[in-house]
């Protein structure tokens, strides 16, 4: 109920009715897993430098449909610490896209599908940082956090246990193949695999 009310007021702020499809009822059994690489961990001051996303339809990752964009930082420069994490240098972004163009392309890609991610709130906050000034809204899509599903799954098996929610731990525990970490597209693929592994487990219920 709260989500419906929130989306009602969110939609009223939409500056361009072309994007009203975002508020349509979510497509059943279709999801978008996405990940952002950024200049840092503060949505207030840091910028997105890459977005990677994949579509899941039913129980299949649709490999023919992917979203990968590199973006020129708007306000921040890359520091040594962040380069060590994602291995993206300023020279790699010299021909990057403008963030406003990428945000609009991203909206077309995700449509009204449910969003899936690992620590998804951070990535959504980064997207919303640019989306709100651009279109007046925040992402209205239904969202699923894989670390929450994994946590509930492990607690069900061993009540009151400590659950390590590090991405690498989850990947290894679920026997997900490891690709290069801190690459937005690779991370979105691995997150999609985590989601499908959990979704299809008999003891897991996706709310």
Residue ranges and their predicted role:
Residues 128, 192-199:
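Short, amphipathic alpha-helical segments that act as regulatory/interfacial helices
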Residues 144-161:
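Short alpha-helix plus adjacent loop in nuclease-associated cores
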């Amino acid at each position: 109920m709260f989500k419906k009310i929130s989306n009602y007021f969110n939609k009223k702020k939409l500056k361009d009715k072309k994007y009203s499809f975002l508020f349509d009822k979510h497509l059943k059994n279709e999801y978008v897993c996405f990940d952002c690489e950024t200049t840092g961990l503060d949505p207030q001051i840091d910028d997105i430098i890459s977005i990677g996303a994949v579509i899941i339809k039913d129980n299949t990752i649709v490999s023919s449909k992917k979203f990968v964009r590199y973006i020129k930082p708007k306000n921040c420069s890359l520091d040594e610490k962040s380069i060590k994490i994602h291995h993206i240098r300023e020279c790699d972004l010299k021909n990057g896209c403008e963030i406003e163009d990428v945000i609009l392309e991203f909206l077309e890609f995700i449509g009204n599908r449910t969003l899936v991610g690992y620590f998804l709130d951070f990535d959504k906050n980064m997207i919303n940082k640019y989306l709100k000034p651009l279109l007046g809204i925040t992402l209205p899509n239904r969202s699923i956090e894989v670390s929450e599903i994994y946590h509930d799954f492990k607690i069900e098996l061993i009540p009151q246990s400590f659950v390590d929610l590090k991405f690498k731990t989850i990947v290894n525990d679920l026997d997900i193949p490891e690709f290069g970490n801190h690459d937005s597209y690779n991370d979105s693929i691995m997150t999609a695999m985590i989601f499908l592994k959990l979704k299809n487990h008999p003891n897991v219920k996706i709310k």
